[in-house]
């Protein structure tokens, strides 16, 4: 059974590098880039090739097709933990994760709408307008 560990502290990064098959982290692409540098150093410190481990990431995703929606959301997000934008902006941001060696990106539904129907509709739009670029 593969072990996935989501962590960022130096000690846990070393333990993850030594024992896990996948490392998970949170953040926007810039934050994940910083964390990836620390994870690579942890792998090297325990004698493990960083490319041997799968990597996954997650961030709060706010699909905001209009500038007004972006402006409303930007005032309330944690910048280094969030992706905010319309379709092309999200495609560009997600492509950066791919460049960083991330194999899988997790999207939590709590940022995609208040009701189940709104979340469903946002997921459908994300799939059609954003995620389809990665298939």
Regions found by a protein language model. Name each.
Residues 1-135:
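Active-site-adjacent structural elements that line small-molecule/cofactor binding pockets in enzymes
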């Amino acid at each position: 059974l593969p072990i996935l560990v989501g962590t960022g502290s130096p000690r846990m990064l070393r333990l993850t590098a030594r024992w896990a098959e996948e490392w998970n982290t949170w953040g926007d692409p810039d934050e994940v880039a910083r964390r990836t540098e620390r994870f690579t150093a942890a792998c090297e410190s325990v004698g493990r090739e960083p490319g041997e481990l799968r990597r996954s990431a997650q961030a709060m995703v706010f699909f905001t097709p209009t500038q007004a929606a972006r402006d409303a959301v930007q005032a309330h997000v944690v910048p280094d933990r969030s992706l905010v934008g319309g379709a092309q902006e999200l495609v560009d941001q997600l492509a950066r994760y791919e460049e960083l060696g991330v194999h899988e990106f997790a999207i939590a539904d709590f940022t995609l709408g208040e009701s189940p129907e709104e979340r469903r509709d946002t997921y459908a739009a994300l799939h059609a307008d954003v995620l389809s670029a990665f298939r």
